């Protein structure tokens, strides 16, 4: 029950939240998405890969369909077009957009989120605090639906050529080594993204076997955060093409040692899906002694040969990450 190889990786589809109408117009004009010098901005930049697809989300409407063709992080981005820096009144903090996605427009569309075809993402949007979230990972059914909306795009966008120095953002494991936006301290949402990308090619088949599932790992998709009425689950695994009923596996990720309350919380989340929730997975560095729970698989994570004084690119951490199902 192996997972998909990297060569066979199916593209993911994301809706990217835009903060105001002017920024939306600039995103569309230049076929570019930008993310702030914050941990959420970095997370989005890491989460979305070249070859994935995105649409813009603003005013409860979904705009256009694009393929991601390039990713770049820019130094001194506060001086770069097209978006001006944004200062928030409550915190007084100013954010700018060093993390950029360069896009190729595939379809022209302007659709309301209330359409049933967007129900997977709309539920996340309503339950997860609206546009404060940077991006929403949609499922294959949503991507299939939007690929038939609107019309093929045959025009040309106004490319923006930036003559500016770039850098590769790094993750550090000591807070004092953090120098934003070049170096960010390791946080749980970064681990979430790493685990989401690692699971399909490593332990998904073993997890399915633990739950007595007969389907192949390739029949499932591993999605990002999923909002629930009582919270949210870090990673959501479901059938790509369900018939009659679906099968869900809920995954929670902890950077340190998992607590018994984390197990209880995961069981509560699973109960919200009833019989369609076949099990839960708790990923952590360590677990309480004699930890066990019906329907929960424990997975230990580690980074091979990690130097806590070092700095690591996301792809290097993905390479070093090891996931091991605890027997």
UniProtKB/Swiss-Prot annotation:
<dbReference type="GO" id="GO:0003676">
    <property type="term" value="F:nucleic acid binding"/>
</dbReference>
<dbReference type="InterPro" id="IPR011856">
    <property type="entry name" value="tRNA_endonuc-like_dom_sf"/>
</dbReference>
<protein>
    <recommendedName>
        <fullName>Uncharacterized protein AF_1446</fullName>
    </recommendedName>
</protein>
């Amino acid at each position: 029950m192996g997972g998909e190889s990297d060569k066979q990786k199916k593209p993911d589809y994301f809706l990217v939240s835009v903060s105001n109408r002017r920024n939306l117009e600039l995103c569309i004009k230049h076929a570019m998405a930008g993310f702030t010098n914050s941990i959420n901005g970095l997370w989005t930049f890491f989460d979305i890969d070249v070859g994935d697809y995105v649409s813009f989300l603003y005013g409860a409407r979904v705009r256009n369909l694009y393929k991601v063709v390039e990713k770049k992080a820019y130094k001194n981005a506060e001086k770069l077009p097209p978006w001006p820096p944004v200062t928030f009144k409550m915190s007084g903090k100013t954010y700018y957009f060093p993390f950029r996605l360069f896009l190729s427009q595939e379809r022209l569309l302007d659709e309301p989120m209330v359409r049933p075809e967007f129900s997977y993402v709309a539920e996340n949007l309503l339950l997860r605090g609206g546009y404060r979230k940077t991006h929403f990972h949609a499922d294959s059914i949503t991507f299939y639906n939007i690929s038939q909306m609107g019309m093929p795009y045959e025009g040309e966008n106004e490319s923006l050529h930036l003559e500016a120095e770039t850098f590769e953002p790094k993750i550090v494991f000591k807070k004092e080594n953090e120098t934003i936006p070049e170096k960010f301290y390791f946080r749980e949402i970064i681990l979430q993204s790493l685990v989401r990308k690692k699971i399909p090619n490593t332990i998904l088949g073993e997890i399915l076997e633990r739950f007595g599932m007969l389907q192949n790992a390739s029949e499932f998709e591993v999605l990002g955060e999923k909002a629930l009425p009582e919270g949210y689950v870090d990673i959501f695994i479901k059938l790509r093409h369900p018939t009659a009923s679906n099968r869900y596996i809920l995954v929670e990720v902890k950077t340190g040692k998992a607590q018994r309350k984390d197990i209880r919380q995961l069981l509560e989340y699973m109960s919200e899906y009833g019989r369609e929730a076949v099990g839960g997975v708790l990923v952590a560095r360590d677990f309480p002694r004699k930890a066990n729970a019906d329907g929960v698989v424990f997975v230990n994570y580690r980074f091979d040969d990690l130097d806590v004084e070092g700095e690591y690119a996301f792809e290097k951490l993905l390479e070093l990450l090891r996931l091991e199902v605890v027997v």
